[in-house]
Amino acid sequence: MLSTLIKKMFGSRNERTLRRMEKSVMAINAFEPKMQALSNEELAGKTQEFKERFNNGESLDELLAEAFATVREVSLRTLGLRHFDVQLIGGMVLHEGNIAEMRTGEGKTLVATLPAYLNAISGRGVHIVTVNDYLAKRDSQWMKPIYEFLGLTVGVIYPDMSHKEKQEAYKADIVYGTNNEYGFDYLRDNMAFSLTDKVQRELNFAIVDEVDSILIDEARTPLIISGAAEDSSELYIKINSLIPQLKKQEEEGDEGDYTIDEKQKQAHLTDAGHLHIEELLTKAKLLDPGESLYHASNIMLMHHVNAALKAHAMFHRDIDYIVKDNQVVIVDEHTGRTMPGRRWSEGLHQAVEAKEGVSIQNENQTLASITFQNFFRMYNKLSGMTGTADTEAYEFQQIYNLEVVVIPTNRSMIRKDEADLVYLTQADKFQAIIEDVRECGVRRQPVLVGTVSIEASEFLSQLLKKENIKHQVLNAKFHEKEAQIIAEAGRPGAVTIATNMAGRGTDIVLGGSLAADLANLPADASEQEKEVVKKEWQKRHDEVIAAGGLRIIGSERHESRRIDNQLRGRAGRQGDPGSSRFYLSLEDNLMRIFASERVGSMMRRLGMQPGEPIEHSLVTRAIENAQRKLEGHHFDVRKQLLDYDNVANDQRQVIYTQRSSIMAMTDTQEVVEMMREEVMDSLVDTYIPPQSLEDQWDPQALSDVLSDEFKIKAPVPDWIDKDHSIQPEQIKEKILALAIEHYDEKVRKVGRPVISQFEKSIILQTLDNHWREHLAAMDQLRQGIHLRGYAQKDPKQEYKKEAFSLFTMMLDNLKYEVIRILSSVEIQTEEDAHVVEEQRRAEQIKKMNLMHENLSENDEASETQTFRRQEKKIGRNDPCPCGSGKKYKACHGSLV
């Protein structure tokens, strides 16, 4: 009541926003005579003037009126298009970081040039986001003359570009591309191995076209970069055959190749064991004669040996796992229950599979992932435009903090939206649609029939073929071809069947596309020939208007009112006539699930017969209520996805920030020293627990681990025997001093710059490996966390708690692994230090899958987009394909 009274007194929020912006429109219009008087050179010089004024302290808001007036004049001179006043308002809404709802045909592509130009003045870049590659290329080419006239550069990004081309494209002032491509490039940049490998600049300002499609419909599934794990089955099998030849050391001082630590569930090679396994590896031709297992090029081989040793020494059949249906299934050590689907990480599961002689599975691992919600919220400023956003205004505000401003049309809307017709059966409904299409054909009125699925569009196509009605079918598969067909859907008598997303972004012009007709003329066509084409188009245009404009037929109500409005919005552009009607049946999915009982009983009471429709406001209201319920359900699903992804997003930001800072470092000494101190402290605390009695200490095990894992000779038992009053802190200091001394020897051999390069490569490589394993662990946690609800626990809180625990564990393991590798690997030349970096770069060339599974029902035609690069497998002892002359394992295959 009170809110209604306030609206009557002051107007709605939308009306107040429009009134405020009308004052700015007057200011822009006041600049128009001045702009018209400028020469082309003077007009082009405005950009430099604006940049200087911005650098001298003027804000973009203060420059807005003059900048918009400049763009409008340039657009008129280059494209012959002058921005309407309502388009200026749309540009202001976008500049303020909100969503402009503009009807179909109101010129959203042209509107984007206003805020794009204004924000490009800052020099920090503008990203314009489209729904497909065709629109990115089309819009960039179409608007390019405006930007280039004003001295700005324009880039466009698409999947098949080379790395260098993409870097150049991102350097442009204004970049066009798809949401998927921007997201994948962000993820790839955070998998890069050096700053020079990155392509994106700062995420400054994004203008998202069809914002409802991108930020809502496609937001239910994340972007994922996954890579098939290297097929190392043969290597696991070969190393598995060597491990039984190693002998366990039963007691300290006895002969033996390895020791076991049951407390930590670890197995370590002794000095004799290192020599023995090197000898066995050489005989198996996995290691060159005289080559050390600890050479930089053999890090991954060492990893396989450790995994196989652990599988044989520490993991036992029917205790730690069982073998069932040719698979190794883990047994939970606490409950004794099997855990199908769970796998040990770091190659251990594959090593156990090799030991048991079952098939070795190579998993498709997630390398990086992000949701669109979290990706687009990283931009300093985000805005969007669409023809249908108001029904989702609450979600835009809640998730993205974006206000929806409904922009009035330039000309009054005269489209006639007819009431829904509801039939008892689908057969009756489709027969009625055929009759409507046939009647339109008699009048030569163009028809667009919208369907909710490819299956429905193909079924309808078959019915039209039986009736000998010519038509075109669009299924949202070939964007460029679609755009051409949809542009011609306004020709007299044209019949087009389209799934809801097909051809979105292209206007249906009554009479067909004049631009396409002119483009089909020969390059040297005379003005007279062009005039003939224009007259023919005008004749067709007038014929369609006389027939009633474009007819929209909906074959089924969608789950979202917004998608229905998008279909209706195809007609009635820029004041054109048009009409729309939805044909429904009680057998349609939405009606069957949500509204059939109520509407069905109503139809029975009215004595409806097969073939007779019902047309009533109560029916329309019942359907809209069903749609509201479903919209609320889908919002809850997306909100829940975001709640969970926010936990992962916090961790992602920490990892990516750390990764970028490490890449930027020239000297990593401080980072490594900090890691070393933490690792040594943690090791001592494990074997000599704080606040414990000396009887609880295990100094020999500590010495063994330091020797076997880190190559540090620390006689901890001797220190304790000589000084019974020695404290754990003193032991830590002694061990740390030995670790520093041991490492300083390596530094002296090759120099600090070389060692820093090697350290950086190892840190990044290890970080990527552990992050990948962590993502898999987070996926597993997410899949089962809802079961905590049965124990009266909040699954989200439990997920946060356990995710934090996993993250802490991952960071601890990361530090341990980095220090272990740096301490044990031998670096003799600068070339050794570059081996890891070269191999990591080669990883980028290997097979990588980019996925965005759009499970949203709103885009029924979309499928998983998977891009693959297939390459022949290279053997470890084959010549490296880079042409160095070395074996693959000693060059780019060193860590594979």
Swiss-Prot record:
GO biological process, one term: intracellular protein transmembrane transport
Membrane topology: Peripheral membrane protein
CDD domains for this protein: DEXDc_SecA (cd17928), SF2_C_secA (cd18803)
Keywords: ATP-binding, Cell inner membrane, Cell membrane, Cytoplasm, Membrane, Metal-binding, Nucleotide-binding, Protein transport, Translocase, Translocation, Transport, Zinc
Known cofactor(s): Zn(2+)
HAMAP family per record: SecA
Enzyme Commission number, as recorded: 7.4.2.8
Protein name according to UniProt: Protein translocase subunit SecA
Assembly with partners or alone: Monomer and homodimer. Part of the essential Sec protein translocation apparatus which comprises SecA, SecYEG and auxiliary proteins SecDF-YajC and YidC.
InterPro entries, alphabetized: Helicase_ATP-bd, Helicase_C-like, P-loop_NTPase, SEC_C_motif, SecA, SecA_CS, SecA_DEAD, SecA_motor_DEAD
Superkingdom as given in the UniProt entry: Bacteria
Signal peptide: none
Record carries keyword Plastid: no
Primary location recorded for the protein, binned into one broad class: membrane
